[in-house]
C-alpha cells in the first residue's frame, strides 16, 4: 500500500472514530426504571434512574438493572463499532495496525 493510500485510510479511520463518538446507544431496564446512554466508543454518556420505579427496600433490584443495562449497552456499542470497522479491517492489516 502506498503512503498516499495509507494516509487516506488513516483519515477514514479518524472519521469513523468521530462518527462513533457522536453515536449514542440507549438501553433501558426495569421497564424504564434505568436507562444507560453510551457512545460508539464505549464511553458512558448518561445513566438515568427513574425514582418512580425504585423500591428503596429492594436496592439489589436497582443494582441488577444497572449492571444489566451497562453490560448490554457496552455489548451493543462494541457490536456497532465492529460493524463500522469491518469494511476497513483488511486495509488496516496492510498498514501494520
Tell where the protein language model's regions lie, with residue ranges:
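Long amphipathic alpha-helical segments used for membrane anchoring, targeting, substrate engagement
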Residues: 1-26, 76-97
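Stable alpha-helical structural segments in soluble proteins, enriched in small hydrophobic residues
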Residues: 65, 69-80
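N-terminal intrinsically disordered, cationic/polar leader segments
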Residues: 26-48
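A short interface-forming secondary-structure element
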Residues: 47-59
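Residue-level signature of catalytic and energy-coupling elements of molecular machines
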Residues: 13, 42, 66
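Conserved acidic
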Residues: 5, 58-62
Amino acid at each position: 500500500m502506498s503512503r498516499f493510500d495509507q494516509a487516506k485510510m488513516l483519515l477514514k479511520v479518524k472519521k469513523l472514530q468521530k462518527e462513533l463518538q457522536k453515536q449514542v446507544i440507549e438501553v433501558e431496564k426495569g421497564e424504564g426504571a434505568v436507562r444507560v446512554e453510551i457512545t460508539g466508543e464505549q464511553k458512558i454518556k448518561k445513566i438515568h434512574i427513574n425514582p418512580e420505579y425504585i423500591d428503596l427496600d429492594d436496592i439489589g433490584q436497582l443494582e441488577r438493572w444497572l449492571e444489566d443495562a451497562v453490560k448490554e449497552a457496552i455489548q451493543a456499542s462494541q457490536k456497532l463499532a465492529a460493524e463500522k470497522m469491518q469494511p476497513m479491517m483488511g486495509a488496516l492489516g496492510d498498514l501494520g495496525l
